[in-house]
Amino acid sequence: MKKSWSRTIATILLFATAPAGLLAQELKPFKIGVVTFLSGAPAGPFGIPAKIAAEVFAEQVNAGGKLPAPYDKAGFGGRPIELVVIDEAGGTTKQVSELRNLVEQQSVDIVVGYTSSGDCLAVAPVAEELKTMTLLFDCGTPRIFEEADYEYVFRPVATATMDNVAAALYVNETVKTFATYAGINQNYAWGQDAWNDFEGTLKSLRPEVTLTTSQMTKLGAGQYNTEISAILGSKPDIIHSSFWGGDLEGLVLQGAPRDLFKNATVILTAGETAIHRQAKQIPDGTIIGARGPNGIFAPENAYNEWFKTAYNAKSDTPPSYPSYHMVQTLFAAKFAYEKAQGGELAKTPTTEEIATALKGATFQSPSGEVKMSLGKGNQAVQEMVYGRTKTVNGKLSFVDVIRYAPEKVNPPEGMTSHEWIKNKLK
């Protein structure tokens, strides 16, 4: 886990028990291209946990009978699955090239990947051009399906709109008195969308509150003392941040000693990944999100119990939300493949049949129920959860946990996030 790869192609081939009348070696593996950060600042908190989740899923699925029903069949409808894992580091141009390589050289059947919203925006039209089913597992910008229609591109996890709408709802409900707010977000699609959604919702709920400062930083900047000084000097009551990965960890490390979290109520919409690595640095009262019902907010169901047990056998750190997003997306792929088979294990469904099976579907996962109800059936919605940190007997715990139903924090089909928020969530 400590090894860093600048460019890695790791292939894991695990054979499953064949269905009656067939030998495992006669079955052509179903190849899944997995794209996640294996190097750089996002690798530790995001990429490596996601990679572990993918490997755990492959091992358990190929063994057969390990997952709860209806996911207990070996492989994908009897076919063993093979992972081709590559590094997401390097920027959008590199990722477009890597996607073409996965399809044209590695001959993958589907692609599961991408944490960066910039990467998702770049690869989506290329995946459509290549007619390769591509499941976006973690990026959050709602623009993917609001600005284009896709036949082959899906996102079986929710957008960041619900993160930030729910953040504003949570602040409005739990902070009785506040007059000012500020933000520190990354200056690209993810951070811009997150800030606009949070501020727009907050202003619709409390039009009298005033912005003190909005700090937009370069992705991966690493040093935030100038921005922290600007925020502290503006003395806001509420601070919103959608920082993730290494940027999030840097903000916590640099902000906590300067009382950034003491002088205001701070809400970290993607803060859950930091609680395992920085539990002692996160002050009590910090509002934390996990980009859905993931990690510490995941429901008690058979799929979650399976996942936690299998993951913890492979890692010293509990699964965080990038791990949940990865396994949820792989659940979607298995669900769609086997639905497209229609119970005929000898059938090899086409890409188009698998895509049709996932469009508009509802399936179960370690994070609960997932509905593909936006983006003409290609975009998922889920509930959103927030809670406040509190140290109890030396351990970080959560209080004031509130769960928001999917329909309360996601726009209706046919309406963009911006339109919905501008219309006061109506």
Residue ranges, per PLM feature:
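Short, low-complexity disordered leader/linker segments with a strong preference
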Residues: 1-31, 422-426
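Immediate post-signal peptide segment of exported/extracytoplasmic ligand-binding proteins
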Residues: 24-34, 73-80, 172-179
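Beta-alpha junction/loop-to-helix N-cap segments that form part of ligand/metal-binding clefts
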Residues: 27, 45-49, 64-147, 156, ...
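Extracytoplasmic "Venus flytrap"
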Residues: 33-57, 87-92, 115, 184-192, ...
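Extracytoplasmic ligand/sensor domains, especially the bilobed periplasmic-binding protein
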Residues: 52, 93, 108-214, 261-291
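Hydrophobic alpha-helical
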Residues: 117-128, 236-258, 329-334, 387
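Extracellular/periplasmic periplasmic-binding protein-like sensory domains
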Residues: 254-328, 337-344, 398-425
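Segments of small-molecule ligand-sensing domains
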Residues: 313-323, 334-404
